[in-house]
Amino acid sequence: MKSPVLLVAYLYPPDNFSGAIRAGRFAKYLRKLGHPVTVLAAAAENAGQVAEDVHRVRGEFGFGLRRDFSGYLERAIHKYFLPSDWGYGWAWRAAAYAARFMRSSPRPVVVSTFPPLVGHWVGLWLKKRYAAGWIADFRDPFWGDPVRNARQAALFDRRMERAIFRNADRVVANTDVLQEDWRRAYPQWREKMHLIWNGYDPEEGLGPLPLPPRPYQVIAHVGSIYSKRHPAQLLASAGRLTERGLLDPKRLKIRLVGTLDRDELVCRELLDSLTASGLVEIVPELPRAASQEVMATSDYLLLLDMLLDVPSVYVPAKVYEYVQVGRPILLCTTRHSPSERVLSLSGVPYRCVFTDDSAAETDRKVLEFLSLASDPAELRAEFAATFAAMPQAIELSGLIEATARMTSYPI
């Protein structure tokens, strides 16, 4: 039998958060490989053992904090000390459950995933308390992440990241750019660093569906839109092209599906104007199955990278769903981003609009993109070898077994 695993994942399916998907894939395919996997996740209320191998304890979510001491403490920590995360109270409740689990035999290898940070808090505590084998998985950068830019958290983040790298047996990055950043920052721990990209589950059966009959084409974005991930360049270009008569608003609809933080957007006036004209359609957040149907029935797909003043180190998780549909993808990103490199490996037609493109260059690219045929393309075999769930689970399984072999629990 393969080594047992305790997967500490604050977010876990069926939670409707993109951060839950990677943990769900890991658990599913590690079990296929013979690992007994127990998941420790959060819930809005204490749910206990919701499945034979999934245990949920009450967590804190920004949209529904309790009006009790734990809720007020959560708000205070979030506001004054660590504004980039939630779930601080969950960490202690989760640790109490994990302590009981660690007394079982054989003891598991702990795999924790971030964000939010509290997953690694639990992993670090289990390492310190029980000498557990520990693999720390990062779905985003941590210290130095341009998005985690709160001044009051900078010193804590740096110290916490060093503690993770010092104590974890393995650390896993989800992009090669992040892995290289780590190697420069912590050369003394290079041998701990591994790369497992985000990916996709072929068994979900996501693929193109027939396009419904309609008098217009649809370019769809599915996911959250906020200050650092927004469609301003595309909207501005669509406005200019419409004014010049090069784009017929009756023949195109830009469909934005998901949460939209209008107050944070630099393009909110333009968004309101194009929505009023009918060129833009805003659809509230949908369940995952419904959002995938939107992807599968769209002529084109819009992928928004993190648009920052520095080169992107991110790859939006949606890219792995989009490429399974196979229809053309317009990527708004920075130059030389890992998102562009992932798309280049897929075999799916795409075009990139870069943050430093001129208005004229952006307009040229948008028109060129909209001239692409919407026939779906098949994924390249080499793409699946890197990004499909089973090859990634095999890689993680190897790390788990290596960690188990080097772990010596105290008697």
Predicted regions and their residues:
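N-terminal subdomain of nucleotide-sugar transferases
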Residues: M1-G59, R170, R405-I411
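A conserved catalytic-core segment of Leloir-type glycosyltransferases
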Residues: V39-M102
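Nucleotide-sugar donor phosphate/pyrophosphate-binding loop at the beta->alpha transition
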Residues: Y130-I135, W143-A163, P202
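A short, active-site helix/loop in glycosyltransferases that binds the activated sugar's phosphate group
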Residues: R162-K192, E340
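Conserved donor-binding/catalytic core segment of Leloir-type glycosyltransferases
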Residues: L211-R229, L235-A238
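Nucleotide-sugar-dependent
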Residues: R229, P287-V294, L301-Y320, I329-R341
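Nucleotide-activated donor-binding/catalytic signature segment of Leloir-type glycosyltransferases, i.e.
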Residues: R251, R255-L260, E264-Q292
